[in-house]
């Protein structure tokens, strides 16, 4: 599991694209020239940006070679760069930085977010969506299984919180619109939940384990999911998935 799997990620393409569409709908910009899609993945969010601003110069950034290859194949009219978001520097100030479900993987948001604002031009926008599920059973159980089986903690850090992000971005000279939404995804089985998180949140926990260790981990994780997520009357499962949205516009 050394690289991201675009096919596995896109298995839930509609569910993953919906937050990006809802974030994009709140971006208060019309005619823009330079856009960066941070953590573009296989290009599903980049395609939305290209559809809204077909004349803009859009650059997708991702650290995964597999994701970049998939994005380039899908969107030949956009530019894609394999790079670490923290180190990438645009050639010019940006009108929009779009980051859908990517910044939660990076540490030090108190430094990262002001840095991203500094890459914007006057009245440019930073639009961010991050899964806020650190306390959801899906992610709590990952940590519990790892503790039970004596594996190191490889989960990401929790988000800083609504009030912290508001202060960080206000102090960086932005007007801030921030909200939180919980989606309830209809899952056909507990295995489907595992399929969902294996493409994202579960990756760090499994990537350094042997095949046997991975199977042991997933078997126990499946058992614990069954305890936490009861079946609905029709046999499906409702997976609560909270997400934090931020649209910050420079006032300078």
Swiss-Prot record:
GO biological process: methylation
Top-level EC class: transferase
Residue ranges of the TM segments: none
Annotated EC: 2.1.1.144
Subcellular location as annotated: Cytoplasm
Pfam families the UniProt entry points to: Methyltransf_25
Record's function text: Catalyzes the S-adenosylmethionine monomethyl esterification of trans-aconitate.
CDD domains per the UniProt record, alphabetical: AdoMet_MTases (cd02440)
Origin: domain of life: Bacteria
Reaction(s) catalysed (UniProt annotation): trans-aconitate + S-adenosyl-L-methionine = (E)-3-(methoxycarbonyl)pent-2-enedioate + S-adenosyl-L-homocysteine
Species this chain originates from: Escherichia coli O7:K1 (strain IAI39 / ExPEC)
Predominant place of localization: cytoplasm
UniProt-listed HAMAP family: Tran_acon_Me_trans
Name this protein carries in UniProt: Trans-aconitate 2-methyltransferase
Matches recorded under SUPFAM superfamilies: S-adenosyl-L-methionine-dependent methyltransferases
Keyword Cell inner membrane: no
Keywords from the UniProt entry: Cytoplasm, Methyltransferase, S-adenosyl-L-methionine, Transferase
GO cellular component: cytoplasm
GO terms, molecular function: trans-aconitate 2-methyltransferase activity
Family (UniProt): Belongs to the methyltransferase superfamily. Tam family.
Disulfide feature: none
């Amino acid at each position: 599991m050394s690289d991201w799997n675009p096919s596995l990620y896109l298995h839930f393409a509609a569910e993953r694209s919906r937050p990006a569409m809802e974030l994009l709908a709140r971006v208060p910009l019309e005619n823009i020239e330079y856009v960066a899609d941070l953590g573009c993945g296989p290009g599903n969010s980049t395609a939305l940006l290209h559809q809204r601003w077909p004349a803009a110069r859009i650059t997708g950034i991702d650290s995964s070679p597999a994701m970049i290859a998939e994005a380039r194949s899908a969107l030949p009219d956009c530019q894609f760069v394999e790079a670490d978001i923290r180190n990438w520097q645009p050639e010019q100030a940006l009108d929009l930085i779009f980051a859908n479900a990517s910044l939660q993987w990076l540490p030090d948001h108190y430094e990262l977010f002001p840095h991203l604002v500094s890459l914007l031009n006057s009245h440019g926008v930073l639009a961010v969506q991050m899964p806020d599920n650190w306390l959801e059973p899906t992610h709590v159980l990952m940590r519990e299984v790892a503790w039970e089986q004596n594996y190191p903690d490889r989960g990401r850090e929790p988000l800083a919180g609504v009030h912290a992000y508001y202060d960080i971005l206000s102090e960086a000279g932005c007007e801030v619109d921030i909200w939180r939404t919980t989606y309830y995804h209809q899952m056909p089985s507990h295995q489907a939940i595992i399929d969902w998180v294996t493409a994202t949140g579960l990756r760090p926990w499994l990537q350094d384990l042997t095949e046997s260790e991975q199977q042991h981990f997933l078997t126990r994780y499946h058992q614990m999911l069954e305890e936490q997520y009861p079946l609905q009357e029709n046999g499906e499962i409702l997976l609560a998935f909270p997400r934090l949205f931020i649209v910050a516009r420079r006032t300078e």
